[in-house]
């Protein structure tokens, strides 16, 4: 078992009482399982197959009602599941919890098992005890793939029981947002209701989940559904005091009412946005602006946004997603943002405007709210039918201004004020009323809600700021201004949606908002819900608007004090600073046929996080298109916020796009996506953009200005991009500008971005990814970056323009950052051109305190047919990290092509950031390329790949690229300026490469310059690189990998590098130029270095010439304190027919650690003299040069670069090439003979060494084979050990089964004893009853005797009376006496019956005695059994002890095996050490070879000192020979040592053979012991059978006892009846006694009276003789009556006889019981005999155990012998090692 069992498994009751999701695993124990279940549980496939072959029931259940398939699915065994399913087992059987194998597999996340079951027809809709299906558990586990599989195999998404939730409700109750979204996509019933009538929305509201509420509202859930109690979701929200959710639902209901009631209503609002749209046919404008996505966190915020959009479209135009101004938060202390975009659109037919503006996504929390505004808000929010009621113009203006656009999280009912008194706090009210939805993912805590409630309860004037009162006329202009408390930033988004910026004085303007739509939402992968709240406006017109905020000093003490309640409302807010941000975009679009403009501007995605922020955004955009045009994603200005203490962003962008036919502009602007985190941020963005296209053009993602935030103390960013594009037919402009992707993270940042883009295309041109100005932010103390790209492109047919600029991707982290980015890019193409990835300004952030970066790229491209222009510039990819960084990047690129040209990856100026304290980088580069047919320009410039880590870096990069191509030309990978980082104190790098290429047919220029690959790591670095390259080819030329200037970093204190290589190449047909220059490969590592490298290379090829790897400038860095190297090589070569120039220049590869003695491989004598003069002027540094650095990168073929400097043949060839290059002066006979001799000696020595190495390798292989044999033997031993373990496990299992059987027997004995006690108690109760009856009958007997005596006396008296005259009276008395006699006879009968009962009682007592005797016998038997059990338990304990000893011995054997393994590892280590020594010898050879090469190089460079160098070489060769001899002796010694080791190994092998023989003997002994164990096991099985027989006998005893109990119950019933009859008789007897006593008294009286009258009778005898006769007749009658009484007595006697017969029957039954007792006694005697036999068997087992002990002792002795042998072998090995 892999899983460990817990200490206590949950019982079935615990599992059923839980929620069903706890305790998913089965509590599996060995005694629960049967044969097939054990095979599955122990993962034994072979055993399972064997069990299935024996026709075992495959669906059999274990003791917990689980099938084998349940266990296989629960333990995750797909092979077992496949086997069981193939044998046709039932798939839908249930366990105790009614769970099928499929449910169990899904619950335990066993996807493979579940898929197998589904593929074979398992039912996914079966419910368990809790009413859940497999889909419920998949939702609970958030397993989307499993859910899709279940749904694909027919699972019902709504299946559940009556009391259980469906899967959608389960996801809501578990707060799983991703699952809710997924189920809604899978078309789950959103309006489903549970058993209480509650919908999913009600559940989400009760849980307080804003994200889920938004999702449900976006999918149009029924808000008006009531539960059983008649409550709505809104009621639950109000009861929970969750204002956010309540206002969401209320806003949704309000929009529903507006949709139903009002289609259009002219409203004059205070923010004064204007939108004009006229459409011709089926036009749609949707999602124009989603200004704010996330919240703004600052102390004081003033934002003005005045966008204007103008557009005209004729047919099928659509404008969607115009602006998403703010996506993320702006976190700062005090922020004043002004956003003034203008958007105008005009269409003729059937235009539709949807989702124009969703101003607010997240909530804003501020201190004060304007009373009049709040009054309007309260009135509108608490009045559902506010639209239908009449309202005044002023009230309606305020309500439409604040309610229809903004969402208010806080309300207060305050007494109304006049408009004049209202003006000053209007800004505060609007700030507080802004509702930002980015916080939806956060649950509303009690603490936050308590704070909010406290803040609401406070009076209005507690946190009011000291602001001068203004007149009522300024109210209209002031409504667009937002403020917050200390620590939050707010910007008003949908202020002046179209066009004209409001003046600072504030003028009134009319606004006609359209009908706002319902929720539209997009879900991201990272955060499941990127919450947006979208709205739309049909016609919005407004003028310009601006506002001013008071500084921090004007605030009151309550505001400035952080301990006040106003400051405590936001916990995450930093201390307030100063921020001034202005955003003034303008946009105009005109389209004729089927135009669509979507996602025009997403101004701000994430807000700046700073103390004070004043942002002004003024973009302008104009677009005109004819047919099927679409403008999308023009500008994504800022994605992540400005994170600084004080931020003043000013963003002024203007776009003008004119489309004629089929142009689509998507995602025009996503202004700001990240916030700036700093103290003070001032950003200005003013990008203009113009584009014109004819047919099916699409502009995607024109500008994404800022993605990440500006994280700095003070940030002033001005972004002024301009984009103009004109296309005729089917053009597409996409992703024009992504201005800033990541924010600027610094203390003070001032960024100005003014890119201009103009593109004109004719047919199907595409310009994509023109500029991504800044990808990562500038992380520094002070950063000033200016980016001014300009792009112009014109194409005729099928052009596409996409991804023009991405100004900033990551944030700039510094205290003071000033960034200005004006870029201009122009591209013109005729047919099917595409410009992709023109500029990526900054990718990573600049981490400095002061960074001033200026980027001025310019790109111009013109192409005729099917050109593609992509990846033109990537200005900065990674950030600059320094205290002061000034980077200026104005690249210019011009490309013209006729047919199928493509320009890709033109410039990537900076990839990684510059990380230093002071960095000033300027990069001006120029590149021009012209090609005729099928040319491609790819990867023209990569400015910097890794960052520059210096204290002071001033880098200037000014690349220029111009390319012109006629037919199918492509120039790839022209320039990669900087790849790796520059790490130094102060770095000033200037890179000015120029590239010009012209080709006619199928030319390709790729990888032109790669200026800097690795960073410069030094204290102060100033690098200037000026590279110019011109190449012209006619047919099928390819230029690739032209320049890789710097690959590795320069690591020194101060570096100033100036590199000015020039390369010109011209070829006619099928020429290829590749890898022209790699300037620096490894870094320069020194304290202060100023390298200047100026190389010019000109190569002219005519036919089928291939130039590969022409120049790898510098492959190694300089490691010294101070170096000033200059390399000025030039290369001129002309090859006419099918020649190849290989390995032209390899300047430096590895690190240089010497004085500037440079290698000049292709230089003239004049150049050498210049170098010598320069070297004499340079200071001397004690360092050396490795000549290997110049010869490692020489290339042997025309296509591949070989940097191998190991083989001597290559070195010889290289030396010969060097001699040829240095003309005839080096070709002396003497020198050549010496060189040849040295080569021959080296070859011979290497051959000898190779032979020795081969011999050593053979020996090593033999040793490895021996080691493998030893390992096999060890593995065999381990298998034997594993078998022993398996056997011990089986013995343990049997012991466990025996213990379990003993426990069961003990339980049964306890039950028997309890039954005996119950029987005894019943017998005692019956005895007591009999005793009580006997006591009652004793006093009755004398009464009966007295009654008989009285009867006799009465008879005598009656005879006497008969004799007298009074016979009549006596006759009457006689009758009475006869009745009494009959009664007495009945009493006699009862007495007889009592006597009989006494006899029966005696018999019962006898039976009881016998029963007690039997119980005593049973007790004796039990005692004997207990004794036998104790004996067996002792034996079992002894066996367990023996097992433990065996285990310990096995562990010892394991340890010995491990020791052997460790020894083998030590041998391996030694072998590895020998190999390392061999490798060291090789390395020494290589070192000698390198020294030899150094001498050869010195001979080439210094012709005058050849003789001295030859002497030095001879000395070095003698030293090498001596070293070789020493090495040979060492090899000889090692060979002898290896021989000794081989002998030792042979000895060890012999010992191992002896051990194997001993192991075989042990195995034989073990087999014999195993046979005895099998016999013992058979006897134990017999013992188990006897126990089973005893169990059967005990069951029979129980049955007999049950029968006896039934009979006793019958007897007791009879006795109860008899007792009842006796009691009745006794009562009658008492009554008769009383009557007889009374009669006796009467008789005595009558006798006395008769005596008195005797005399009278005697006297009257004669008179009464007649009377006597009459009396005689009466006596006859009395006799007749006596006969009748006799008959009655006979009947009573018969009844007594019947009773006697019943008693006889009972006696017979008692006899039967006695016989049964006798049988039970016989069975007990048989059991006693069996126990005696078992005792004999136990004695035999003891004897066998003794034998086993002896065998185990023998094995122990053998193991000890083995251990001794192992110890001896270890000692031998130690001796061998010593």
Swiss-Prot record:
Coiled-coil features, chain-numbered ranges: 1157-1187, 1247-1333, 1362-1480, 1544-1768
Extent of Polar residues compositional bias: 261-272, 297-306, 631-653, 679-691, 983-992, 1005-1026
Keywords on record: ANK repeat, Coiled coil, Phosphoprotein, Repeat
Sequence ranges of Basic residues compositional bias: 942-955
Keyword Protein transport: no
Gene3D superfamilies attached to this UniProt entry: Ankyrin repeat-containing domain
Database matches in Pfam families: Ank, Ank_2, Ank_4, CCDC144C
Superkingdom per UniProt: Eukaryota
Protein family membership: Belongs to the ANKRD36 family.
Protein name: Ankyrin repeat domain-containing protein 36C
